[in-house]
């Protein structure tokens, strides 16, 4: 079933007769739009009698506003979803391993460069989307998780330089890190 967050009727049709929904909003960009879309989905879920909402926040989020636009935007999305009467479980993955599959990353790796907007010593928990999906499916069977915000990541917390070493092992020319500033120009 295809639904468009900007089209309430398509959301209504997509969640008709379901007990639970998985929700993933955009993780960066227009916070107001994301919040509006989240509220549209929440209201449709309330109207449809959905019993549980499982959210993939797509990234880390603070528990209180921190002053960083994207992180605070994810927090506001979570809080809008949690503001309704339906129990909500939020999963907060840190970084997706599939981020390394993008054309920009691959093109740079072919040149022996690893460019990512993290400092060399920043340690993060990378996770694959398949594992995120497993957490979300498991939440359907664990009602005691309702109301929780759960940070999830892979088994190893890796610094950017450790990721470069691992990625470089799979590249004939190796890889060296190029730290990029995460702030917009």
Residue ranges and their predicted role:
Residues 6-9, 16-18, 28-32, 44-52, ...:
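Oxidoreductase cofactor-interface core, primarily capturing Rossmann-like NAD(P)-dependent enzymes
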Residues 37-40, 44:
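Short, conserved SAM-binding segment of the class I
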């Amino acid at each position: 079933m295809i639904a468009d967050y900007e089209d309430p009727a398509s959301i209504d049709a997509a969640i008709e007769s379901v007990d639970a929904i998985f929700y993933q909003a955009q993780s960066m960009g227009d916070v107001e739009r994301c919040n509006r879309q989240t509220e549209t989905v929440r209201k449709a879920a309330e109207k449809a009698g959905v019993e549980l909402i499982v959210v993939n926040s797509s990234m880390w989020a603070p528990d209180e506003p921190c002053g960083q636009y994207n992180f605070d935007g994810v927090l506001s999305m979570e809080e809008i979803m949690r503001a309704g009467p339906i129990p909500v479980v939020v999963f907060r993955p840190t970084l997706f391993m599939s981020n390394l599959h993008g054309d920009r990353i691959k093109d740079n790796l072919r040149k022996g460069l690893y460019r990512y907007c993290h400092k060399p010593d920043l340690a993060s928990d990378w996770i694959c989307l398949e594992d995120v999906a497993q957490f979300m499916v498991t939440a359907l069977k664990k009602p005691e998780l309702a109301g929780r915000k759960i940070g999830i990541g892979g088994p190893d917390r890796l610094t950017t330089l450790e990721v470069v070493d691992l990625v470089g092992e799979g590249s004939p020319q190796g890889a060296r890190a190029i730290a990029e500033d995460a702030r917009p120009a």
